[in-house]
Amino acid sequence: MNKIAFIYPGQGAQKAGMGKDFYAYSPLAAEIYDKASEILNIDMKALCFEENDLLDQTEYTQAAMVTTCLAMTAVLEDAGLHPDVTAGLSLGEYCAIAVAGGMITEDAIRLVRKRGIFMQNTVPKGEGAMAAVIGAETELIEKCLAPIEDVSIANYNCPGQIVITGKKLAVEQAVETLKAAGVRRCVMLNVSGPFHSPMMIPAGEALDQEMTDMQWSELKIPYVTNVTAEYVTDIHETRALLAKQVASSVRWQASMERMIADGVDIFVEIGPGKTLAGFMRKINRNAKVYTVNTVDDAQKVIEEFRQLII
């Protein structure tokens, strides 16, 4: 018996035109976009489907990504394809929790809009930075970072790809230290803040307050949290984990390894791009990964797994 995981990408995967074919194809998907436009007072179709300058601004990106990923998921689930477990990278974790049954679509969209605003406004522009470290051993990176204050690891994405985060000068110092240690590729990222660093703790605190009056539901299936790379089956843990997540390392590689060890053998990446599929090729080449970012992709996945659909 196959075990299926739905996995969701994070900020940075967004692109103009994402989800446009789903809106035209599925009334369920269209309803999610229209509902998001209504509750946020944003033209979500213009934001997601047309070239614009807002899509790459954190306060808009996060709501656009979650709306799109949940609209795509609605098409799969309407056809009867459901996951046994979910996970999402950073922002994608909100999709994972919503699909696992922990929060309704409207609340997920509303909450990530606030999250985006908090994250964008917590640290003044230019004070924080992030950099991708390519092709280096994790132990070497951790050793190089240890003596440097105000820099830490944001993402353990996969073997050979680590993202560091923190104060701009500290990240730049870390990059120079890594290069001196023989690391060939360090790329400064074009981001609006030092995400997943302790500098984001105030954003986590604001997010925690925002969740005070939210209605949570018991999880129908588990999700794997970025913070610990462990299964979450109790919704009461979720608020604290989400508040902590914005200032904590994303343990994506360990999350995928945890799922594989638990018998997950099919991963469906839902959302724009193929970032997570690329990570998985370096984590475990034997894992079967399908990407769904067009209606054609969705139809192929539904057809392939028709025998799993009850």
For the regions a protein language model found, what residue spans apply to each?
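Short, flexible loop segments at boundaries between secondary-structure elements
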Residues: 228, 288-309
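Alpha/beta catalytic cores of group-transfer enzymes, especially the acyltransferase/condensing modules
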Residues: 11-13, 101-247
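FabD-like malonyl-/acyl-CoA
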Residues: 2-140, 189, 266-296
